[in-house]
A protein has these predicted regions:
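Acidic/histidine-rich, metal-coordinating catalytic segments
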Residues: 9-23, 27
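Metal-dependent phosphoester-hydrolase catalytic domains
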Residues: 22-128
Length: 128
């Protein structure tokens, strides 16, 4: 596994992983179980990667509960009102620095800009 063999200490991985692993990372867990980005197979694969190097999901460490999304479909013109999102963008850190991560937030308002991405920026700070 690449993430385990070549992983330096004090690592942070960020990106659009296109998988929403938790029930509160999608607008309707049961409806999305057969939809790409929230299938049991994808969640299991992502969890395997996460556990292979003991990655810590910094966003969920900081915001452990509640609905949390970083993506809303372009097909939904009323994306803000409908709020049918998914948390597809992640910030993970190795255990040795995870405790220093704080202040995670998603800039939801950016999704409402003229000609926006369907993803909103995800932030976390680290006091190293």
């Amino acid at each position: 596994n690449y993430f385990k063999k070549k992983l330096p200490k004090k690592s942070v991985m960020v990106g659009d992983l296109n998988i929403a692993p938790y029930e509160e990372d999608v607008w309707d867990h049961k409806k999305l179980l057969k939809i790409v980005s929230h299938t049991p197979e994808e969640i299991e694969a992502l969890n395997d990667v996460k556990s292979s190097a003991n990655w810590v999901d910094i966003t969920r460490k900081d915001i452990p509960s509640g609905l949390l999304y970083s993506w809303w479909s372009y097909r939904a013109r009323d994306w803000d009102t409908a709020n049918k999102g998914r948390r597809l963008d992640h910030i993970w850190a190795t255990e040795d620095i995870a405790e220093y991560g704080f202040g995670s937030h998603i800039l939801r308002d950016v999704r409402g800009w003229d000609k926006p991405s369907d993803h909103a920026p995800v932030f976390a700070s680290f006091d190293l």
